[in-house]
Amino acid sequence: MRVSKYLLSTQKETPANAEVVSHQLMLRAGMIRRNASGLYSWLPTGLRVLRKIEAIVREEMNKAGSVEILMPMVQPADLWVETGRFEKFGPELLRFQDRHNRDFVLGPTHEEVITDIVRKEVNSYKQLPLNLYQIQTKFRDEVRPRFGVMRSREFLMKDAYSFHIDQETMDETYEAMFQAYNNILTRLGLSFRPVMADTGSIGGSMSHEFHVLANSGEDLIAYSTESDYAANIEKCEAPLPTETRQAATSEMTLVDTPNAKTIAELVEQHGIAIEKTVKTLIVKGATEEAPLVAIVIRGDHELNEVKAEKLDAVLAPFEFADEAAISDAIGAGTGSIGPVGLNMPVFVDHSVSIMSDFGAGANQDGKHYFGINWERDLPEAAAFDLRNIIEGEPSPCGKGVIALLRGIEVGHIFQLGTNYSEAMNANVLDQNGKSKTLLMGCYGVGVSRMVAAAIEQNNDDRGIIWPDAIAPFTVGILPMNMHKSHRVKDIAEQLYQDLNDAGIEVMFDDRKERPGVMFADMELIGIPHVVVIGDRNIDNGMFEYKNRRTGEKQDIPLGDIVEFLKAQHA
C-alpha cells in the first residue's frame, strides 16, 4: 500500500479525553475516530488489524467444529420476554419500537435468537451435538463508555452456542472451545491466562474467562503460586478464619468522631487497629419487606459485589443504596453507619463473625461505638464469604498462596445448562422417543476489544508494537529523499513490487515528507519490520533494516532483503 493513496490519519498530540494507552494510540495512529459516546468508526489501519484478528478467530472456530451463521443485530423483544431477560437485563438493553409499534431490542447477545432457531430446526438427538457461531456487531447501552473500544457501546464479537442432549458431549465441546480460545490468543502473540469465572447475568454452571495480561487491566486475577489454579477475584473464595472469637475485654462505648468519615480517618485519629474496625455497607434489597440490606466487612477488606449479589436478600443486579434512602432509614450518613441496632437484614463476612471488641459507626452522625461484641451488643448475624481474597492468603486449591495479576477480559465461555432451552421449550426426542430439554454452551470473544488489549500489552513511548500476526502491515519501506534521488526511487519501487509478489503486506511511504515524520509514523503505527533506503546505503550495496520490537538495526545486502524479511515474518 502506497501511503500517498492511503488514509493515514496520524496525530502528534495525545488526545485529552483518552484515558488509557490503547485509546490514545488508536486515535493517534489513525485507527479509529469517535462518532458519539462509545461509538467509533474504524479507519483503514484499525480495520486491517480488526480483520486479521477476525480471520484467526474464524479459522480456530472452524477447526474446533463450529459452523458459522449470521443472526440479526435487531431482535424481536418477544424472545427476550420468553426468557425473562427483557425486564431483568436493565438499561444496557436498548429497547425500541418499529413503525407498527412492535417491540424490538438491539442485541447485546444472541442466546434467545439462537435458541429460537435451534428449537425450530432441530428435533432429533441425531442432529446433536451442534455448535454454531457468528461474528457480529453487538450493542450495550453502557452508562459510562470508557477507554475507547475497550468499553464501547457498539462492538464486534464472536459468539458461539452449542446444543447437547447429554453432559458428556457438553463437556467435550466445552473443552474443544477452551482449547480453541487458547489457540486464538497464542496465534495472536499475546500473553494471556484462562481463569475460573462467575457466570454473571448470562447464568449457568461452569465458566472460564480469558484475560490478556496488562497492568492497565480492570480485572484482578488470583492465582496460586504452586499450582495451575487461577480465578477472577470475583470468583476466588476467601479462606475461612482459622482462629476463634476471643472473649470480650471492654465495654461498648460511644465515642465522638466528628472528623472520621472513613476507616482510614478513624484509624489515624483514634488509634484503633484497622483489623478491629468494620465497614457497614447499605445495599438495595430484593423484596418490598426488606428494601435495604446491610453488609458488614472488616475495615481492611474489600467487598466482593459478585458474592454479595448471590445473597437471596440482595437485589440483582447489585446496587448500593443512595444517600437519601440511607438517611431516611437510619438517620445518619454513610460515614457513621454500623451494625448495632440496625432495623434491616444484616449479613457479615466470615472474618467479621469472629471479631470482638471492634469499632463501627453508631448510626449517629459524627459518632462511633468502640468495644462492640457479638451477642452482648448485637445479635449474631448470618456469615458468608463476602470479600475479595488478599495476596498472600492460602489458595483455595490447597497449594501455595494467592498472587494477583491484572488482566483484560477478552473471552468468556459458559456451560449454560438448560437456563434458556427450558424457558423457550427447546426440546428434542432422545433415543427412546422421549422429549428432552437441550443443554447449552455459550462462548464469546470480544474481537474489537482484542485490538485494544493487544496494544495495552504491546507499546512503548513511540507507539504500538504489534505482534506480526495482527500488524496492519508487515514491512514498512522508508525511501530517503526519493523525490530527489532516482536511484532511491527505482530501488524502493522494485522492493515494493518484490515484496508484494512474495505475499508480504507492505506500507510504502512514498510521500514528499521529512524523514523524521516518516520514521515517527512507522513507529507510531507499529510496523514490525522497517527497511530504510538511502543513497549512502545503496553505495554500500545495503539496505538498513530495523526491528520495531527490539530496536535492533542491521545492514542487509540488496539482493538478500526479500528472503531476509520472509524469514523474519515466518
Swiss-Prot record:
Disulphide bond pairs: none
Reactions accelerated catalytically: tRNA(Pro) + L-proline + ATP = L-prolyl-tRNA(Pro) + AMP + diphosphate
GO MF annotations in UniProt: aminoacyl-tRNA deacylase activity; ATP binding; proline-tRNA ligase activity
Class in the EC hierarchy, top level: ligase
Family of the protein in this entry: Belongs to the class-II aminoacyl-tRNA synthetase family. ProS type 1 subfamily.
Compartments (UniProt record): Cytoplasm
HAMAP family, A to Z: Pro_tRNA_synth_type1 (MF_01569)
GO biological process, one term: prolyl-tRNA aminoacylation
Enzyme Commission code: 6.1.1.15
GO cellular component, one term: cytosol
Domain commentary: Consists of three domains: the N-terminal catalytic domain, the editing domain and the C-terminal anticodon-binding domain.
The protein, known as: Proline--tRNA ligase
Keywords, sorted A to Z: Aminoacyl-tRNA synthetase, ATP-binding, Cytoplasm, Ligase, Nucleotide-binding, Protein biosynthesis
Protein biosynthesis is among the record's keywords: yes
Superkingdom of origin organism: Bacteria
